Amino acid sequence: MSSYARRTPVRTVLNFCTAIRQIITGEAGSVAADKGNRGQKRAPLLHRHRLHAWLYLGSAITTEVTGTVILDFSEGFQLPAQTTAAMALYAFSFFLLTRALRAVPLSVAYATWSGLGTVAVAFAGAIIHGEAVTLGRITAITAVIGGIVILNLATTRQHSARRKDV
């Protein structure tokens, strides 16, 4: 066996470890590599990963709400096409939620997903079915949104405090 063949696995492991370290510290992808953007800063990889997670979460909320609205048109599971579409959208929503959980804490992701989904379904009910918009409903929706905002702010501050301690 040549010395090159023996060094290749070790070099591969070292390169892998270096890449992981760069991803964790945000060094990877911080400067654009292509000629058109040479020297221009890009967001560190972890920040982009977090942005993607929030996009996954937004998509999960959208698919869950769409599934719920379609489920309402299934007439109690009597219409197979609407029932199948709703179940497929629910499954896809859970898939997107699990992708979001890679970078968003569970408590924040689930509260945001379920809370904003509830708010969106309430709006859909008012728009599609003409459900009454009462002061009580508006107050409840405002409370849900306020709770989600407070939870997100508290979690962001907690993560910032942890980073300063390290």
Swiss-Prot record:
Induction pattern: Is transcribed only in the presence of nicotine under the control of the transcriptional activator PmfR. Forms part of an operon with nepA, folD, mabO and purU.
GO CC terms, sorted: plasma membrane
Keyword terms of this UniProt record: Cell membrane, Membrane, Plasmid, Transmembrane, Transmembrane helix, Transport
InterPro entries named in the record: Small_drug/metabolite_transptr, Small_multidrug_res
Subcellular locations according to the entry: Cell membrane
Ranges that cross the membrane: 51-71, 77-97, 108-128, 133-153
Principal localisation: membrane
GO molecular function list: transmembrane transporter activity
Protein family per UniProt: Belongs to the drug/metabolite transporter (DMT) superfamily. Small multidrug resistance (SMR) (TC 2.A.7.1) family. NepA/NepB subfamily.
Protein purpose: Component of an efflux pump responsible for the transport of nicotine breakdown products, in particular methylamine, out of the cell. This pump apparently serves as a metabolic valve for nicotine catabolites and may protect the bacteria from the potentially toxic side effects of these compounds.
PANTHER family, A to Z: MULTIDRUG TRANSPORTER EMRE, SMR FAMILY PROTON-DEPENDENT DRUG EFFLUX TRANSPORTER SUGE
SUBUNIT field: The efflux pump is composed of NepA and NepB.
The protein's name in its UniProt record: Nicotine metabolites export pump subunit NepB
